[in-house]
UniProtKB/Swiss-Prot annotation:
<comment type="similarity">
    <text>Belongs to the ycf35 family.</text>
</comment>
<dbReference type="Pfam" id="PF06868">
    <property type="entry name" value="DUF1257"/>
</dbReference>
<protein>
    <recommendedName>
        <fullName>Uncharacterized protein ycf35</fullName>
    </recommendedName>
</protein>
<dbReference type="InterPro" id="IPR009666">
    <property type="entry name" value="Uncharacterised_Ycf35"/>
</dbReference>
<keyword id="KW-0194">Cyanelle</keyword>
<keyword id="KW-0934">Plastid</keyword>
<dbReference type="GO" id="GO:0009842">
    <property type="term" value="C:cyanelle"/>
</dbReference>
Length: 128
């Protein structure tokens, strides 16, 4: 049966979420915008991801955390929901770490994507 599902993400930082979506080459739009399921059930989202089948998905901030909103029956992304969330959370964590290291005066020197899917980040800070 078609219905909108909320999936917990533990994502709290909007800018890092948007950077993570960009890093995964996922096109998104700022909200508020409405998404709906087959039966017309609607939900307003803060970040919208359009799908070719017109059953769009998105993120809504509830309390402190963003939740993924989707009609899972009509999921149309290149990955399963689980893989999508895993990759999104990895990129989100990477963005949080990178932003924090830059704020602390470090500079990114290099990043490597290993065969196992992990990301290796090399930073440095000059002391004067």
């Amino acid at each position: 049966m078609s219905h909108l599902t909320q999936v917990q993400t533990n994502i709290v930082n909007e800018e890092a979420l948007k950077k993570a979506l960009n890093a995964l080459n996922i096109k998104w739009q700022d909200g508020p915008q409405n998404i709906k399921n087959l039966y017309g059930q609607e939900q307003t989202v803060d970040i919208l991801i359009k799908q070719k089948n017109n059953f769009d998905i998105g993120f809504v901030k509830e309390e402190l955390e963003y939740k993924l909103i989707a009609d899972l029956q009509y999921w149309e992304q290149p990955y399963t929901v689980e893989t999508f969330l895993q990759q999104l959370k990895q990129q989100y964590a990477y963005q949080i770490i990178l932003d924090e290291t830059i704020n602390k005066g470090f500079e990114k020197l290099e990043e490597e994507y290993d065969k196992d899917g992990s990301i290796r980040l090399v930073v440095q800070r000059w002391r004067y």
